[in-house]
Amino acid sequence: MRASLFIVIFVVSFITISCLSTDDEEARWIEKRGDCLPHLKLCKADKDCCSKKCKRRGTNPEKRCR
C-alpha cells in the first residue's frame, strides 16, 4: 500500500514537471518567433525572416521573406 502510494506520487509529479517544461519551451518559441518578419516583408538577411528565407525574386531589386 505504501509503495504504491509513492509510485503514484512519483508518476504524478513527473507528469506535472514534464508538462510545465513543455509550456516553457512553447513560450520561448513564440517569443523568439515575434522577433522575425512574416512572409513577403522586406528583409536583409535569412535570419530576419520567420521562414529563414530572404530572397530576391523577379526584376524587383528588394529582398523579401519567402
From Swiss-Prot:
Transmembrane segments: none
Predominant location: secreted
Residues the UniProt record annotates as site (Essential for stimulation of [3H]ryanodine binding to RYR1): R64, R66
Region forming the signal peptide: 1-21
Molecular-function annotations in GO: calcium channel inhibitor activity; toxin activity
Domain of life from the UniProt record: Eukaryota
Function: This toxin stabilizes ryanodine receptor 1 (RyR1) opening in a long-lasting subconductance state (20% and 38% of the full conductance state have been found). It promotes an increase in the opening probability at intermediate concentration. Furthermore, it triggers calcium release from sarcoplasmic vesicles (68 nM are enough to induce a sharp release, and 45% of the total calcium is released after toxin (100 nM) addition) probably by acting as a cell-penetrating peptide (CPP). In addition, it has been shown to dose-dependently stimulate ryanodine binding to RyR1 (EC(50)=6.9-71 nM).
Protein name: Hemicalcin
Native species: Hemiscorpius lepturus (Scorpion)
